[in-house]
From Swiss-Prot:
Enzyme class per UniProt: hydrolase
EC numbers, comma separated: 3.1.1.11
GO cellular component: extracellular region
Native species: Solanum lycopersicum (Tomato)
Organism classification: Eukaryota, Viridiplantae, Streptophyta, Embryophyta, Tracheophyta
A molecular-function term among this protein's GO annotations: pectinesterase inhibitor activity
Protein's UniProt name: Pectinesterase 1
Sequence similarity: In the N-terminal section; belongs to the PMEI family. In the C-terminal section; belongs to the pectinesterase family.
Gene Ontology BP annotations: cell wall modification; fruit ripening; pectin catabolic process
One Pfam assignment: Pectinesterase
NCBIfam families from the UniProt entry: PME_inhib
This protein's encoding gene: PME1.9
Binding site for substrate: T308, Q338, R450, W452
Active site residues per record: D361 (proton donor), D382 (nucleophile)
Propeptide: 40-229
Reaction(s) this enzyme catalyzes, per UniProt: [(1->4)-alpha-D-galacturonosyl methyl ester](n) + n H2O = [(1->4)-alpha-D-galacturonosyl](n) + n methanol + n H(+)
């Protein structure tokens, strides 16, 4: 115990106040210098990592945060920084999920309840995509970078889809999930990956003479066969002669995360049901007796309370999905606005010899790499839309008679960031009018597309364009929105609607004359087809000139 007469603090010698002030000033100056120099050093060292970001300062601030929190060091390379950034990002998305789930349980509005249900599904998918991207980036190869770019493009698309479906009230409520920040971080991740990829070479590997490489030799044989000749794992038949009477039952019974092809054969007939192939239903093939014999039909639509995302008659997000010899339709009609027949968010998916029928928003090519061959798609407004990396070859794209005062738009592509590896490519196809539109072409103009999002990207090449196509070719979405940032191109088309002399004069529109500029939109380039399509057995052309 201290002596009660002894002061608790020992008395020190009195210091010169001028010297003390100088020492204090030096310490403060040193601290400020270090505080200012550290971010500057981060900016200099890692500026290349953020060079393709739309907001490079935001990107650098994220890197600085990782360093400040000792997650990475100033000496860490770009791959390591990106992987740690994504680990943090996955953690943020996982934290957002229970917040959205709680909000969904509290909200009474049917449409917003549905929108939050969609957001939950999309967040779950995004966690998987980002986690898979970390593993792919760690391998440091061009092909794995291409995979990561596709998956991270899907993450950004998922977040934007969620935000698009929410009304202003729900957006305010959901602010606790920092959805806008999740979007910003997805864009930064794509920018970082793009900077690493350009150092290692272009992600789009040219592999000529092959199908998209995600198609195995066994799948190739399956796709060369008809449904009745395939030895299926499960058979669906309305008359009870199969294993199941509905497709939904057969899909539910399919194995989860299958590493081998699982085939469901659907016998001829019309099946009134809505079917979802979830992300855990991998390598699933659904095959019918032909696009005019086996039909899956539904009628969900936005007017009656569904979200666009959930209105699909058939939705598929399980990787490696194949759909063949079947018709998918939504019969809601033009008065019901958005009513999707088929939604696909399955990476490395193939739609072969199928018919997809509806009016507005017929085919939602939502995200990931997709290939459509020898198929027949009908619709009116934005009837092929979404933000997938998708190639159509030898398809019939048929515009129908729309509702009163409507205009037909073949495409509405939804790319929101220049680093997304997404776009719509239409090659060796016929774009024509249906029999009910043909007599009234002058009343209902038809355009090749309009920009749904800021960096919309669509190319039509080596295709037949019927007389239904308006001479302007393309239409605005809203005034001058996206006209400078979109990329719309036409290359070597033919037919009465193919003339380009009266086409729009937008900065983002291009009449392509150099084949090298058309190559990025081929199977080999846009969807890395050389690495996966060959094994499916579906016919395809990987380059130009059929």
């Amino acid at each position: 115990m201290a002596n009660p007469q002894q002061p608790l603090l020992i008395k020190t010698h009195k210091q010169n106040p001028i010297i003390s002030f100088k020492i204090l000033s030096f310490v403060i100056t040193l601290f400020v210098a270090l505080f200012l120099v550290a971010p500057y050093q981060v900016e200099i060292k890692h500026s290349n990592l953020c060079k393709t970001a739309q907001d490079s300062q935001l990107c650098l601030s994220y890197v600085s945060d990782l360093i400040s929190n000792e997650i990475v060091t100033t000496e860490s390379d770009g791959h390591s920084i990106l992987m740690k950034f994504l680990v943090n990002y996955v953690h943020q998305m996982n934290n957002a999920i229970p917040v959205v789930r709680k909000m969904k349980n509290q909200i009474n509005d049917i449409r917003q309840h549905g929108a939050l249900t969609d957001c939950l599904e999309l967040l779950d998918q995004s966690v998987d995509f980002a986690s898979d991207s970390i593993a792919a980036i760690d391998k440091r190869s061009r092909s794995e970078h291409a995979n990561a770019q596709s998956w991270l493009s899907g993450v950004l698309t998922n977040h934007v889809t969620c935000l698009d479906e929410l009304d202003s009230f729900t957006k305010a409520m959901i602010n606790g999930t920092n959805l806008e920040e999740l979007i910003s971080r997805a864009k930064v991740a794509l920018a970082m990956l793009a900077s690493l990829t350009t150092q290692d070479e272009d992600v789009f590997m040219t592999v000529l003479g092959k199908m998209p490489s995600w198609v195995s030799s066994m799948d190739r044989k399956l796709m060369e066969s008809s449904g009745k000749d395939i030895i299926a794992n499960a058979v669906v038949a309305q008359d009870g002669t199969g294993d199941y009477q509905t497709l939904a039952e057969a899909v539910a019974a399919a194995p989860d995360k299958s590493k081998t092809r699982y085939v469901i054969y659907v016998k001829r007939g019309t099946y009134k049901e809505n079917v979802e192939v979830a992300s855990n239903k991998m390598n699933l093939m659904i095959v019918g007796d032909g696009m005019y014999a086996t039909t899956i039909t539904g009628s969900l639509n936005v007017v009656d309370g569904s979200t666009t995302f959930r209105s699909a008659t058939l939705a598929a997000v399980g990787q490696g999905f194949i759909l063949q010899d079947i018709c998918i339709q939504n019969t809601a009609g033009p008065a019901k606005d958005q009513a999707v027949a088929l939604r696909v968010g399955a990476d490395m998916s193939v739609i072969n010899r199928c018919r997809i029928d509806a009016y507005q928003d017929t085919l939602y090519a939502h995200s990931q790499r997709q290939f459509y061959r020898d198929s027949y798609v009908t619709g009116t407004v934005d009837f092929i839309f979404g933000n997938a990396a998708v190639v159509f070859q030898k398809c019939q794209l048929v515009a129908r008679k729309p509702g009163k005062y409507q205009q037909n738009m073949v495409t509405a592509q939804g790319r929101t960031d220049p680093n997304q590896a997404t776009g719509t490519s239409i090659q060796f196809c016929n774009i024509i009018a249906s029999s009910d539109l043909e007599p009234v072409l002058k009343e209902f103009p038809t355009y090749l597309g309009r920009p749904w999002k800021e960096y919309s990207r669509t190319v039509v090449m080596e295709s037949y364009l019927g007389g239904l196509i308006n001479p302007a070719g393309w239409a605005e979405w809203d005034g001058d929105f996206a006209l400078k940032t979109l990329y719309y191109g036409e290359f070597m088309n033919n037919g009465p609607g193919a003339g380009t002399s009266k086409r729009v004069k937008w900065p983002g529109y291009h009449v392509i004359t150099d084949p090298a500029k058309a190559m990025p939109f081929t199977v080999a380039k846009l969807i890395q087809g050389g690495s996966w399509l060959r094994s499916t057995g579906v016919a395809y052309v990987d380059g130009l000139y059929d």
